[in-house]
């Protein structure tokens, strides 16, 4: 749901941004305005700690944990569990995602808790009798669910990098589920718009989110007694309760009764994985993001590397020339995504080649500022030898400078719409993120290849891109977004707006966005760009499509004195950045 003031705000942002795109070969990046003087858009400010999330109640849970002495990881896990209660559209126990952690001493690590295909999954399981993808199977059936990873990921993070016990950080979520909370605008709207398509088809789901034959409305109280019991068991017995105990039994029985594939053995075998983040240097800043099976980190760094080959400062924010260069760079990156990206435990992902600056230069040499290249003429690049809206994001920074960026999901809104037995837990439809048939797009229009084909115990490719930017050796920007295929370009523009433009975090958040993903061959834009600019882009050969808002960033910027500046996205309602 888009805030009524959003379009007016992005229009102002576009006018105020001025000339701000720049590249490494250009003069130094402009100094950052942290939003304390003449800027129109002002971030939230705090001294000790800050949380930015899509839900105000969950944000407050995180702030309370920080106030009680918890670190950023403690708060991040508490927020994640709270969102599973208050933002069931995407917050979850039955899904998965990624967490990026940067400690106060500068160590940065990535935790992969992406869902896994069950052991009985087969390559062609989502094809019909004619050999074509069947979206009902991959989106709304019990076959659509991968083995969930959220509980394992949160436990790995808490055990290794947190300071509080599990029962402490789960307690706020348990109370919210047991006692209930007031349904806000965002949840009411999504229940009506998206929930109506999947939730009423399943009695367990309908019993939770429906009242007298209608979806819950704003102002109603949502009590989730069964979810409270599951949270209580996890708090008392740890992740084994989810993967080997009563909850595992409920999930396995739900699958067995309804033709799903997840078994108790799949759940018992699931492990979250700690990985080395993807990193790159851009104009004196270090950018850290998720490695595969996320494609986000690789392609954010790849596109930034391409942009370094252009002196973009003279073009200005939102100009046709600047947008042309970025859109063309995005086409090449998404073409590579379709060919090379997959689960690194199963396929060799050429991440070093894709993030190589020489490779970026070879792409930049093919970009014509005056003429768009049709997507049909763009093919995945020839690489050097191997060396390898329905989501939610939140960011946390604590008083010591520890930072956490988390993006996790059920895939589409409310996932399959299936609640597993009496667990109160909604299940994901993440299997749709595999390439059911190479060359055929998924629900987000993304095209994949053999590297992302369905396979047993494999993790599907993702666009989720929790990102941390470092300046002068210190955490500077913590950001991320939902948005399916548009996550990568949304996060990219937050980084570019902040570094190249000197925008404060609120300005960078409010600025209008655009997106090109190679296929379909269209340049998707939000309202807020000049009509003349869009006409110029069309004259260059871009197929401009004016569509709804993109992304919902939740970001925190750290000033040179350690003061925190945060912003929640005006494209969402009921989100909140808060600190103390």
Regions of interest found by a model, annotated:
Residues 2-24:
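Gram-negative bacterial Sec-dependent N-terminal signal peptides
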Residues 26-60, 72-73, 77-238, 242-244, ...:
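Noncatalytic scaffold domains of N-terminal-nucleophile
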Residues 65-66, 152-160, 237-244, 249, ...:
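Alpha-helical support elements that line or immediately flank enzyme active sites
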Residues 85-110, 261-263, 403-471, 501, ...:
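Active-site rim segments in enzyme catalytic domains, especially the processed small/beta chain
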Residues 274, 388-391, 413, 462-464:
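Short, small/polar residue-rich loop motifs at catalytic or cofactor-binding pockets
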Residues 310-410, 422-423, 438-439, 447:
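Internal maturation/activation junctions in enzymes
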Residues 458, 500-548:
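Extended C-terminal subregions enriched in glycine
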């Amino acid at each position: 749901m888009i805030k009524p003031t959003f379009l007016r705000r992005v229009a102002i942002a576009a006018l105020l941004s001025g000339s701000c795109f720049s590249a490494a070969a250009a003069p130094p990046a402009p100094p950052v305005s942290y939003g304390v003087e003449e800027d129109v858009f002002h971030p939230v400010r705090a001294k000790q700690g800050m949380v930015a999330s899509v839900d105000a109640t969950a944000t407050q849970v995180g702030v309370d944990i920080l106030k009680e002495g918890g670190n950023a990881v403690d708060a991040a896990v508490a927020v994640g569990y709270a969102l599973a209660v208050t933002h069931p559209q995407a917050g979850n126990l039955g899904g998965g995602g990624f967490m990026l952690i940067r400690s106060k001493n500068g160590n940065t690590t990535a935790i992969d808790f992406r869902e896994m295909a069950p052991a009985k999954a087969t390559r062609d399981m989502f094809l019909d009798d004619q050999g074509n993808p069947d979206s009902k199977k991959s989106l709304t059936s019990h076959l659509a669910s991968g083995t969930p990873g959220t509980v394992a990921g949160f436990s790995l993070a808490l055990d290794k990098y947190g300071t509080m016990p599990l029962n402490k950080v789960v307690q706020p979520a348990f109370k919210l589920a047991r006692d209930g909370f007031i349904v806000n605008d965002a949840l009411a709207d999504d229940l009506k718009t998206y929930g109506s398509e999947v939730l009423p088809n399943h009695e367990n789901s309908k019993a939770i989110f429906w009242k007298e034959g209608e979806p819950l409305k704003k102002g109603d109280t949502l009590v989730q007694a069964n979810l409270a019991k599951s949270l209580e068991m996890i708090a008392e017995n740890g992740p084994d309760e989810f993967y080997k105990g009563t909850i595992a039994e409920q999930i396995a029985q739900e699958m067995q009764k309804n033709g799903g594939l997840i078994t108790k053995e799949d759940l018992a075998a699931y492990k979250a994985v700690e990985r080395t983040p993807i990193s790159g240097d851009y104009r004196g800043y270090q950018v850290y993001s998720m490695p595969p099976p996320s494609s986000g980190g690789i392609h954010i760094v790849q596109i930034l590397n391409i942009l370094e080959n252009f002196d973009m400062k003279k073009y200005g924010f939102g100009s046709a020339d600047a947008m042309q260069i970025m859109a063309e760079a995005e086409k090449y990156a998404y073409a590579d995504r379709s060919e090379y990206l997959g689960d690194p435990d199963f396929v060799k992902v050429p991440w070093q080649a894709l993030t190589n600056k020489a490779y970026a230069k070879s792409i930049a040499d093919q970009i014509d500022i005056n003429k768009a290249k049709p997507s049909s003429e763009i093919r995945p690049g020839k690489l050097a030898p191997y060396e390898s809206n329905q989501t939610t994001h939140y960011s946390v920074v604590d008083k010591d400078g520890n930072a956490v960026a988390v993006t996790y999901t059920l895939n589409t809104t409310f996932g399959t719409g299936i609640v597993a037995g009496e667990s109160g837990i909604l299940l994901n439809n993440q299997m749709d993120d595999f390439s059911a048939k190479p060359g055929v797009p998924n629900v987000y229009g993304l095209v994949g290849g053999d590297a992302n084909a369905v396979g047993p115990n494999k993790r599907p490719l993702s666009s989720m891109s929790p990102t941390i930017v470092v300046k002068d050796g210190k955490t500077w920007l913590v950001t991320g977004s939902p948005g399916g295929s548009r996550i990568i370009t949304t996060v990219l523009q937050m980084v570019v707006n902040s570094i190249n433009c000197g925008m404060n975090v609120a300005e960078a958040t409010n600025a209008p966005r655009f997106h090109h993903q190679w296929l379909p061959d269209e340049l998707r834009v939000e309202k807020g760009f000049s009509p003349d600019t869009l006409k110029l882009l069309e004259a260059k050969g871009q197929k401009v499509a004016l569509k709804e808002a993109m992304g919902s960033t939740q970001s925190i910027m750290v000033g040179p004195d350690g003061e925190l500046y945060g912003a929640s996205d005006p494209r969402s309602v009921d989100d909140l950045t808060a600190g103390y």
